[in-house]
Amino acid sequence: MSDIKQLLKEAKQELTNRDYEETIEISEKVLKLDPDNYFAHIFLGKALSSLPASNNVSSNRNLERATNHYVSAAKLVPDNLLAWKGLFLLFRTTEVVPDILSYDEYFDLCGQYADALLKQEQSQVELINDIKLLKKTHPDCQKAFYQHLKPGSLMAETIGRHLSTPQDALLNLIKILSNIETTEIGKTLSQNRLKLKASDPDYQIKLNSFSWEIIKNSEIDQLYNQLVNILADDQKRSEIENQWLEYRIKVLKSMPLDVKKDFFTKVKEMVEDMVLVNHQSLLAWQKYFEWTDYEDLDNMDAPLIIKYFKKFPKDPLAMILYSWLSSKLSKYDIKSLESANKPPEGHKKTEKETDIKDVDETNEDEVKDRVEDEVKDRVEDEVKDQDEEAKEDEEEDLDDIEIGLLEEEVVTVLTENIVKCKNNILAHRILCQYYLLTKEYEAALPYIKNGISLIAYNIKDLGVHLPLTKREFSLDLATVYTYVDAPKDHNAALKLYDNILSGDFSNIQAKMGKGIIFIERKNWKDAMTLLTQVHEQSPNNLEVLSELSWSKAHMGYMDEALAGLDTVIKGIKGMDLRSIDFRALNLWRQAKVYIMKHASINDAKQENVKCAFKLLIQSIKILDTFAPGFSTLGDIYCHYYKDHLRAFKCYFKAFDLDAGDYTAAKYITETYASKPNWQAASSIASRLIKGEKAKAELRSNNWPFRVVGIAHLEKQEESDSIEWFQSALRVDPNDVESWVGLGQAYHACGRIEASIKVFDKAIQLRPSHTFAQYFKAISLCDVGEYLESLDILEKVCQEAATEESFQIGLVEVLMRCSLDLYSQGFLLKSVSIAKDTIERIKIIISELKCENQQVWIYLSQVLRLFIWIESKVDTLPVESLVSIFENSQFSGSEEIDSVDNIKIDTLLDSTTDDNVSIACKFLILASKYSVSDQKFTDIAGTVRASYWYNIGISELTAFITLKEPQYRDAAIFAFKKSIQLQSNTSETWIGLGIATMDINFRVSQHCFIKATALEPKATNTWFNLAMLGLKKKDTEFAQQVLNKLQSLAPQDSSPWLGMALILEEQGDIIGSSKLFAHSFILSNGRSKAAQFMYAKNVLENHINNGDDERDIETVEKLTTASIALEQFFKKSPDSQFALQCALLTLERLHHYENANELANRLIGILEKKFEKTQDERELFNFAIIKGQFARIHLGLGNFELSIENADLSQGIISESSDEKSMKTKISNHICLGLSYFFLNDFDQTLNQFQELLSISKDSKHLVVLIAKVLYDVGESDTKEIALQELTEYIATSGADLLVTLTIAAMSILDDKREDLSIILEELKALPLSKQIIDKHKDAPYLIEEITKRLYRNDTGKQVWQRSAYFFPNNLKVWERLDKNIQRRIASNGQNKVTAEEMSKLYCESKNLRSIQRGMFLCPWNVTAVKALNECF
């Protein structure tokens, strides 16, 4: 022992001398002798902490050893402060904490040091300051710091009050641990989430297991428990308890299933305790109600709900619960509940209770404000309806309204707040119960499914055990399956009931549900059997007895059913809405049983019906919103009392209350449709379709869809009607009426082909359906199938001869067919059909007495057709038209009659009118008669405007046709009237512009400009404006307008025709000719103006132009002009100028027979005009035509008639000396000379030729003609004279190709060799310009012939070779050289060849294929036929 003391003295001395190494060595020797030596540990701690760092040992190692020795010394003698002071001096001067010593170890030592200081009654200030400094400089020590300040720890008990309150310490520790826990859970989940499949059913459970690994060792729950127990502030404790509950629910979700159940019990007990003490935690209240497994929603703790609602009036769950209490469908009396919940007056409360009351009153005020806002309008309405004298009752009613909610507001609150309670089971259960009680099964379905999912989620996540709620949702789902989409889901409903019964065999609701399914299936026997068993099991259940009695009634046990229902009615005691509804239902069932009983016994006195009637009245008095009562009452009025007005009212009331009442809806719809009021019928049908209760009926009855479709057709909303008709056909594909309606909709939407197919389907289903055939015919007409359409309509009209619509439809198709034929150029056929149309109209007006406006419009169209085709106006059925107008009532149109004076009486009295004039007057009358069946002033303004427009068009047509000014004035008057009534119609402005074109240029221009503003793309407006400009010689303006028109309608012939007229006016003959031809081609030769202008232009280009008759191109153009004029004459047969053009054309084409007919017609027209006017100009024109007629007779070989006409013409114009007269005189002399020549009167022939030469010696054609005639006489002297005339012409006028060729031909015929040599040289020396003129190569031919006669060889072939060099594409040249090349050139289209010539060329190849081509080109070619025969 003395050695130890000595060593300690030495160590102390060395320590004083700061020889730390020696101190360490001595102290270690002491510890070897005495391991628990207090001072040795202190000396070692001091020395080691003071020892500087060396190469072998680090300073941290020394500090660690020093710390351990200080701690060891403190543990050996805790009450000795020396070691503690050295240790904490070390802590203060070095970074031992936290580098060597952890925070937990440090704070443990702090607690022990504080305890030693306390025992020694020493100051703790320095220690406290050290702790605070450490906390400040080392923020990461917070967790350990607060861990050691938990109540019960040594540090907390000694110096905790100086550092923090226990409440703050626990609260801060909870926050720190919660943050750490949340961070670790998030990190773990992010690491493992991707390792799991989201589709895995246990995905969430597996994720929770990762969280549980972190949470299971957590002390947060215990800390919350400690904190709650020590909190004195109620509000603070309430907040902490709410946080604790949230944490516990979080822990509950992460727990494994095996431990979740026990912990859920703890959490649930905590929630119940919190609610018991009226806790401020909203979550606790929500979970309390959600986790309470109510057997019946009518047995909830209503006062507690009121309390909950007043505490949290804005909470969605509270509002839903309160609305359920307020609903008339629940068993609660909200008024009594509210009254019982009010505190008694004068009750004294403590200060704390007063504060709570203030809060409750504030909440109550919020509730009232909320309720008052929702029912404000209804309160005002109720107050207004009260009697002013009952002021006290009014105030009481107002108070009643303020308590609870109205039923409409209940629905609003439920539907609005369920969105905010998506995860609350009880909220879904309440809403589902409400929907089921109101029989809105389809609306309940999604909430039932959500509720079942929420239960499964709560069981899996929280371990919630709600067997009763789960059973109720299963029953609700089965109930919905019973009624929604029945009977599709009946099997699913039965399985649900069986599952419930497997766990609870005595469940009355499940058994009753199965019975109701049997009732819905009309399986009354099984229903009665099952419900009998249920009734025996529960004899006091009135619902079971009611359903059983209803089943017995349908099985024929009427008396038993009535007795059972009477028992049910007597057993109903409650006065809530459900009880009242149940009483009304059973009274209705009794009434139905009486009606069934009446039907089974056929009671003539209708006693049972009277009983049923009384019961129904009673049920309606009990519950005026019971729809089946009104519906059945309607049945009685309709079928038994025959009072259809009251039946309609009852049905309407029933349907107003229940949009799913199929019987009421059908009766109301049929009533509206019979009026017809399709819009009202559609509204009823639409409501029936939208309602879910009638879906079972709508699976087999499609009339509601058809009614809605028809209503859309009536509103001209055809595209919307299509889907309704399609829906109707999905229900019943054999419904003909729906097919017809669908076809009409397709037709109106422009889908004509589809409509035809649909009508075919309807006809296939019912061939006798006349309307389907009628509509098909109309559709066929729209696609241009007029013949098939007419065949169908003829049959339909025969089957239903008195149906006006069919007859009018036939007239329409006939009219459209005739117009279509007219547009295609089939004018005569068009007129024929127009006549049939008039006869049909006669039947409609005379026999059917129908004066539909459309009929008069159709009559106007066909009459206009006769005016357009004047050649057939004599076939106009005047007698039928007279009959039509005489059988029509016409009040007269004095305004227009005073202008045109057209009436049926004046028309019949007139004897001077021609056929065209009569047709025009009938056209005007047809326009006037179009509104003769009603008072004109009562018609809508737009209709009157169209009436005046139709009259204006008819008057304008008459003016254009007859050129009589009174019709123009009448047209202007009518158009102005139409514009006054409706000024936004471009057609009226166009008509007025045309009518005023000859009167006032500015007015006409204004009208056309107005029309273009209203309808900028209307081509006829621009064309008329251009013609107006051209009429005023403003070609530049007209050209600009036509350019605009060409951009709008380049395929239209009108702008091209206008451009041609402009170019003609400007003198561009070539350009105008091309455009006239282009316009004629674009119109397909059907435009009247294009026909006439093209023919005129062709004649201007080819008359007096020296064209050879052998030119195919000229003949082609003249032939086309002839055809154009032929079509023109069908429309305007008496056009004088057109007839003259046609005579010229036919004369050039040598069609003398046709020309003769036209000449006779033209002469007759001129004679009539001359007789009527006695105008010398008409006589002059007559003479000109007579001269032309003489040429036609000359062509026909009628020489004497030719002489007669020529003499007559010559006599009339003998004194005239103008150019036209001189041409006619020359023509007359030629006709006379040639006629006398062919009549062998040579003297007269010579006289006429001498006269001819005296008039004109400059015409080479006249000289050649005379020479040919003289040469043809055959006398040598006449031949000499002929040659002499030709040579004289050459001497005076110079060399001419025609004259030279004529001399050559005469010389060849006379075989004058001395002259032939000279002529040959002249022909060979012809310049190239003359050879170009010689298109038919007459010169090479004559050279060849002369060569043969002079040299007797084929050297003349060289001239053809030379011509081939200059003219390689000339067929005549290659005809002499090579037939194959000639055929190839002809077939390549390089030359115009007639079909017969081409056919001959093909036949000459002696090839079968070529011969067949020749036959195809020209079947009348005899040569081709012979060649083809030779091939076989």
From Swiss-Prot:
Superkingdom, natural source: Eukaryota
Family of the protein in this entry: Belongs to the SKI3 family.
Key words, A-Z: Antiviral defense, Cytoplasm, Nucleus, Repeat, TPR repeat
Subunit structure, as described in the record: Component of the SKI complex composed of at least SKI2, SKI3 and SKI8. The SKI complex interacts with SKI7, which makes the link between the SKI complex and the exosome in order to perform mRNA degradation.
Compositional bias (Acidic residues): 382-397
UniProt TPR repeat ranges: 4-37, 47-80, 425-458, 471-507, 508-541, 627-661, 702-735, 736-769, 945-985, 987-1018, 1226-1259
Biased composition (Basic and acidic residues): 344-381
Function per UniProt: Component of the SKI complex involved in 3'-mRNA degradation pathway. Represses dsRNA virus propagation by specifically blocking translation of viral mRNAs, perhaps recognizing the absence of CAP or poly(A). Essential for cell growth only in the presence of M1 replicon.
Note: Present with 11900 molecules/cell in log phase SD medium.
A GO-annotated cellular component: nucleus
Cited SUPFAM superfamilies: HCP-like, Protein prenylyltransferase, TPR-like
UniProt name for this protein: Superkiller protein 3
Intracellular or extracellular location(s): Cytoplasm; Nucleus
GO biological process terms on file: defense response to virus; mRNA catabolic process; nuclear-transcribed mRNA catabolic process; nuclear-transcribed mRNA catabolic process, 3'-5' exonucleolytic nonsense-mediated decay; nuclear-transcribed mRNA catabolic process, non-stop decay
Organism: Saccharomyces cerevisiae (strain ATCC 204508 / S288c) (Baker's yeast)
TM region positions: none
Disordered: annotated span: 339-397
